Amino acid sequence: MTPQNPEISTAGAVHNTTEAADTTAHITVEGFDSLVPEVIDLDAPRDGVPLVIETQSGLERCAAALAAGHGPAGVDAERASGFRYGQRAFLVQIRREGSGTWLIDPEPFGDLSIINDALRGVEWILHAASQDLPCLSELGMWPDKLFDTELAARLAGLPRVGLAAVIEQLLGFGLAKEHSAADWSTRPLPEPWLRYAALDV
């Protein structure tokens, strides 16, 4: 089954303003001029590092919790680019208000359509979605609605559009990215990597 194109949204992140005598769209970011200059480093999730889901019962519990959550879902995937051929996901991270953060090892399952079903109709938030959507699709995961924070940052004209840079510029938080190019096929995954992964959503 070919995935349908998600509805891509940038609402809430950017808005257009036009002058009566000027038909050019000017894109601005809410609160951009009032950024906090002091950056606060984030080194651990406020609700701790979750256990990695590796069992069917854990996956079912995760799906039920995500379905019971509210609002959009932050989604990310970690690969082993540079270490293995292909773009397979070796860890999937999801966070949704009311359900918490979930780290899923896709290796024992191969198919995560139960998670996709739990998020049916929910807007997904990804950064640089074009990098993660192919590997998520291989797992049976595809959003109905999508908000790409990298695309929003580009539309807003931010000088740097990497996830850590966007978070620093707009929220005043420092996000460590030292494990982004790690070999995520490694098992077991080291605890610092899991902490990094949980902070990524």
Enumerate the language-model features and the residues they cover.
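Conserved DEDDh/DEDDy metal-dependent 3′-5′ exonuclease domain
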Residues: 47-75, 79-201
